[in-house]
Amino acid sequence: MSRYRGPRLRVTRRLGELPGLTRKASKKSNPPGQHGQARRKRSEYAIRLEEKQKLRFNYGVSERQLVRYVKKARAQEGSTGTNLLRLLENRLDNVCFRLGFGGTIPGSRQLVNHGHVTINGKVLDIAGYQCKPGDVISIKENKASKKLVEGNIEFPGLANVPPHIELDKPKLTGKINGKCDREWVALEINELLVVEYYSRKV
């Protein structure tokens, strides 16, 4: 399953607020469809599927990518759910979003893909790069790159930069100083349900 490129508000009407996907809020409260979804008790599978979809759409990863992240999270010590969230939070496109370089994760991904972002002084156009402690993320030293970011950083998608990331706003630079704490994940998600969803699939 490839990355979603359709209407974003349609997704948030179905799944709720996804801060990484869009800053806009739908004026319609009912789920998408001619008459919305019928009111009936959802199965446990449907609930787990919805949580998985929240994670996919918020961070903008494909099903195949998410499966890889789940496998990697399982192989690490500690809680698989927390490990999974940290892997997604450490993606370069998400770190740029948390720094305020892009208004959304898709916007930040575009900055990375188009070569406007450097890691430790070198241009890196891989949005899924896993940022690690000590990495310095900067906007490339040219007018075009800086102009793209300056408007976003004054009105970031999320108000607060997580404490594990250090932002030097005038220099348009950030530094990773540690791991992301669970409480600083902006998405309202039950990651344990995502792990359960994949328990028989991965």
Curated annotation (Swiss-Prot):
Superkingdom of origin organism: Bacteria
GO terms assigned for molecular function: rRNA binding; structural constituent of ribosome
Residue span of region Disordered: 1-42
Keywords, comma-separated and alphabetical: Ribonucleoprotein, Ribosomal protein, RNA-binding, rRNA-binding
One matching Pfam family: S4
GO cellular component assignments: small ribosomal subunit
GO biological process per UniProt: ribosomal small subunit biogenesis; translation
TM annotation in the entry: none
SUPFAM superfamilies in the record: Alpha-L RNA-binding motif
Stored Gene3D superfamilies: Ribosomal Protein S4 Delta 41, Chain A, domain 1, RNA-binding S4 domain
Domain S4 RNA-binding: 90-152
InterPro entries (UniProt xref): Ribosomal_uS4 (IPR022801), Ribosomal_uS4_bac-type (IPR005709), Ribosomal_uS4_CS (IPR018079), Ribosomal_uS4_N (IPR001912), S4_RNA-bd (IPR002942), S4_RNA-bd_sf (IPR036986)
Basic residues composition bias: residue spans: 1-13
Job of this protein: One of the primary rRNA binding proteins, it binds directly to 16S rRNA where it nucleates assembly of the body of the 30S subunit. With S5 and S12 plays an important role in translational accuracy.
Alphabetical list of HAMAP family matching this protein: Ribosomal_uS4_B
Recorded family membership: Belongs to the universal ribosomal protein uS4 family.
The protein's assembly and partners: Part of the 30S ribosomal subunit. Contacts protein S5. The interaction surface between S4 and S5 is involved in control of translational fidelity.
Protein's name in the database: Small ribosomal subunit protein uS4
The organism's taxonomic lineage, starting at the top: Bacteria, Bacillati, Cyanobacteriota, Cyanophyceae, Synechococcales
